[in-house]
Design a protein with these regions (language model features):
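Short beta-strand element of the alpha/beta-hydrolase
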Residues: 71-79
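Primarily recognizes the serine-hydrolase "nucleophile elbow" in alpha/beta-hydrolase
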Residues: 131-202, 220
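Mobile cap/lid helix-loop segments that gate and shape the active-site cleft of serine hydrolases
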Residues: 42, 46-48, 193-228, 234
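N-terminal cap/lid segment of alpha/beta-hydrolase-fold proteins
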Residues: 21-68
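C-terminal catalytic histidine-bearing segment of alpha/beta-hydrolase fold enzymes
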Residues: 249, 253-301
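Short beta-strand/loop motif that positions the catalytic acidic residue
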Residues: 238-240, 244
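Bacterial Sec-dependent N-terminal signal peptides
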Residues: 1-23, 301
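Catalytic nucleophile-loop/oxyanion-hole region of alpha/beta-hydrolase
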Residues: 86-87, 91-94, 110-147, 281-288
């Protein structure tokens, strides 16, 4: 069943390709730091026309190369409450859209927090995000990319991971590495993101999956990323819907306010409706947030 699912996933990705060249690569060249040997198996589920991946054991980075690259790249973290990955409409579809702009897209299949497969599940996803940034920066010359134009993007819980990478780059999740390559992203794109673990606005599923049922006050503060923004945080672009019943819009608002307070360049687009998980297309409006993002990316170059 697993091999059949893998074949179906590869077919799905191949059918999504236009002029792009797609390459899936292991995130780590050898052993995965902090990993445990486990009987857990990766699951690929096709549901309601979408693709979901859970129980990720071996993280990968899939590079979508445009026909003519402009040097900018974005690492994309799909959402799914830190319990699964919406790899299609919050991953592959986004990389395809970036390719139309000449931007190289990287879809990150990151490990989801699980005590069975990692020594510290609170830092496992961040370790993968930091390794992805490190990898792209190290290979930038070979791939024709600008090492100073590497962004990170995330949806929902993937937005929490992206905002963690944007605020915790001085905290190496893999404390065994001797690599000094910078893991600071050059910009962050946060789409209906989980930002805060303040109980009043937290997405409880993401909070529990990442930190367990009884996190300490220090853990909650550490991973409430509106509290971790500094003047050195990268520019941020945020999108959210006011009627989001899953991740309250206050998550984006607090991050935006933290950016303004710390004089970090930020732009936020709030739509009155759209709910949660709309991906590229908020059907309640004719305005396309990806067009707004395109303008912003052109402005920060």
């Amino acid at each position: 069943m697993r091999s059949r699912n893998l074949v179906l996933l590869l077919i799905f990705i191949s059918q999504s390709i236009l002029a792009q060249t797609v390459t899936e690569m292991p995130l780590y060249p050898a052993a995965i730091p902090g990993a445990k040997i486990s009987a857990v198996k990766e699951q690929i589920i096709f549901t309601n026309g979408g693709v979901r991946i859970s129980s990720v054991i071996t993280p990968t980075l899939t590079k979508f190369s445009p026909a003519k690259a402009n040097g900018m790249s974005v690492i994309i973290c799909p959402g799914g409450g830190y319990g699964r990955l919406a790899i299609d409409h919050e991953g592959v579809d986004i990389a395809k859209a970036f390719n139309q702009l000449g931007i190289t897209g990287f879809v990150l299949k990151y490990r989801l927090p699980n005590d069975s497969i990692m020594v510290d599940k609170t830092t496992g996803p961040l370790q993968d995000a930091q390794q992805a940034i490190r990898m792209v920066r190290q290979q930038s010359a070979a791939w024709g990319l600008n090492p100073a134009k590497i962004g990170i993007m995330g949806f929902s819980a993937g937005g929490h991971l992206a905002s963690t990478a944007a605020t915790h780059f001085n905290m190496l999740a893999d404390q065994t590495t001797k690599d000094t390559t910078s893991v600071r992203p050059d910009f962050a794109i946060l789409i209906y993101p989980v930002i805060s673990f303040d109980d009043s606005i937290a997405h409880k599923g993401s909070k529990t999956n990442l930190m367990g049922k009884n996190p300490t006050a220090d853990q909650v503060k550490l991973f409430s990323n509106e509290l971790q923004v500094t003047k050195n945080s990268p520019p941020a672009f945020l999108v959210h819907a006011g009627d989001d019943g899953t991740v309250p819009v206050e998550n984006s608002i607090r991050y935006y306010q933290a950016c303004i307070k710390n004089k970090v360049v930020a732009e936020m687009h709030l739509y009155p409706k759209g709910g949660h998980g709309f991906g590229m297309n908020n059907k309640t409006t004719n305005d396309k947030w990806f067009d707004r993002l395109t303008n912003w990316l052109n402005a920060i170059q």
